[in-house]
Amino acid sequence: MPHVDSATLLADLDPEQEAAVRATSGPVAIHAGAGSGKTRVISRRTAYAIATGVVPADQVLVVTFTEKAAKEMVERLRSLGLPGVTARTFHAHALSQLRHFWPAWHGGAPLPELLDSKLPMIGRLARQLPGHYRFTPSKDLADEIEWAKARRIAPHDYERAAEAAGREAPIPVDLFIRIFGDYERAKARAGRIDFDDLLVETVTLLEADPDATATVRARKRWFSVDEYQDTNPLQQRLLELWLGDRDDLCVVGDDYQSIYGFTGATPAHLLRFR
């Protein structure tokens, strides 16, 4: 790997950015909005930690919220002379782990095929609803299913959980529970999983298999999470399982810009971060 000059990484930063880049150990929270140069800070901080010997490049994981952001981060790090750093979404990293561990957990069977979108399947099920409810937008139903799965709420537990959260389903609750359950069963019959299942199954596996968890933790030990205000409870739990009792975690976000709240994300994780 090419030598990276740590001084060069600090040369064009303002004082606040430099302080963030130099904070390479322990839990770090960076509150930064759009236009603040946060992507540059994340990439420089990562490069600085590697250049100063804090962590090897192959033990770093930068978590982004979109594939586009992950690709941009990889390109930025490559331009800094660091081609070996992993930058992925929660779902992409979970997928890589499931592909590795799934066969051992399921009698050698490969990981089921991933649905590109849950909307077509939900749409077909929605058309079987009575009366005008069959015209309910599939996106509204999908969002509510995502909210539930972000909290590992099964269909039969939905009514109680939604009431406790003060949440109203897009259709009468009995019909929503029917759609939710039918959707889960339809996926199982088709031998498919969705993007929510990637996280649910990874969390379930890591909670139940200490050996798998130890393997995962041995591979990555230094974490940065961008757009942390958009993490949901399931992603937060997965992050905790990846991290274990270590504290080399940097979260970056802006609690005024949470854009995924309707599917269960909350800026509370950022606001409570220690």
Question: What would you call each of these model-derived segments?
Answer:
Residues V74-R76, R99, G123, Q236-R237, ...:
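Short amphipathic alpha-helical segments
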Residues A51, R78, L82, L95-P103, ...:
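Non-catalytic alpha-helical coupling and interface elements of nucleotide-dependent molecular machines
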Residues L115-K187:
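Coupling/switch/interface segments within P-loop NTPase motor domains and analogous charged loops
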Residues L10-R22, G26-H31, V41, L61, ...:
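Conserved helicase NTPase motor core
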Residues M1-G108, P112, A214, A268, ...:
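P-loop NTPase Walker
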Residues V4, T8, I50, A148, ...:
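Residue-level signal for pocket-adjacent positions within structured domains
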Residues L80, F101-G108, L125-H132, A148, ...:
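Alpha-helix C-capping/helix-to-loop hinge sites
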